[in-house]
């Protein structure tokens, strides 16, 4: 009996690890603007995660948005916003993307900027960096030079912080 439980646990852990890796690969593909690979990795994710994980839902919407498949992007946004348990970060992000599709740039920017603040407040640096990446594109499109400079500065600070953290980790490993 214990061996059977161990085997089942191992299978569940392997499935979860696969999901984590694929989720990160989808995000990396988005950040690198390699949408074809993003869709490929998304297709490899187990269906149960595609509906339960709002990060993956967001990545899926962004992929469809960036390849100009607005119909599917809106469909996934509508589905997500109809869920009462959705958090404020995702709700604002999805509403911002909907405004973006509907050519309401000012409202879209306002919603997406709020996501940056929510992510930072929650200590979710990776989400904040994703928001900055999108804001960078929006500010370019809307010719908002003063905000664009601020985003570039924030992105640079994040990269410096990430680099500093890596150096600290390396020193810690060498000391051990």
What are these regions, as identified by a protein language model?
Residues 4-15, 40-52, 76-88, 116-125, ...:
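Solenoid-like repeat scaffolds
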Residues 19-70:
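Long, well-ordered mid-to-C-terminal structural blocks that present hydrophobic/aromatic surfaces
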Residues 147-176:
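Terminal, low-structured helical/coil segments at or just beyond the last alpha-helical repeat
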Residues 17, 23-24, 57-63, 90-101, ...:
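"A position-specific structural signal for the A-helix of alpha-solenoid helical repeats
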Residues 25, 32, 67, 102, ...:
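Structural motif corresponding to the intra-repeat A-B loop/turn of tetratricopeptide repeats
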């Amino acid at each position: 009996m214990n061996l059977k439980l161990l085997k089942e646990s191992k299978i569940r852990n392997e499935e979860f690890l696969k999901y984590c890796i694929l989720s990160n690969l989808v995000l990396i593909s988005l950040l690198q603007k390699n949408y074809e690979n993003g869709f490929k990795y998304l297709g490899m994710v187990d269906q149960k995660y595609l509906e339960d994980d709002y990060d993956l839902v967001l990545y899926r919407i962004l992929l469809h948005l960036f390849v100009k498949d607005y119909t599917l992007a809106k469909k996934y946004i509508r589905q997500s916003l109809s869920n009462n348990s959705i958090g404020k970060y995702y709700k604002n992000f999805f509403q911002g993307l909907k405004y973006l599709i509907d050519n309401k740039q000012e409202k879209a920017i306002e919603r997406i900027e709020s996501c940056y603040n929510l992510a930072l407040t929650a200590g979710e640096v990776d989400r904040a960096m994703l928001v900055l990446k999108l804001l960078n594109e929006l500010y370019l499109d809307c010719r908002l030079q003063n905000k664009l400079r601020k985003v570039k500065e924030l992105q640079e600070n994040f990269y410096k912080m990430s680099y500093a953290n890596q150096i600290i980790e390396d020193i810690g490993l060498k000391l051990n």
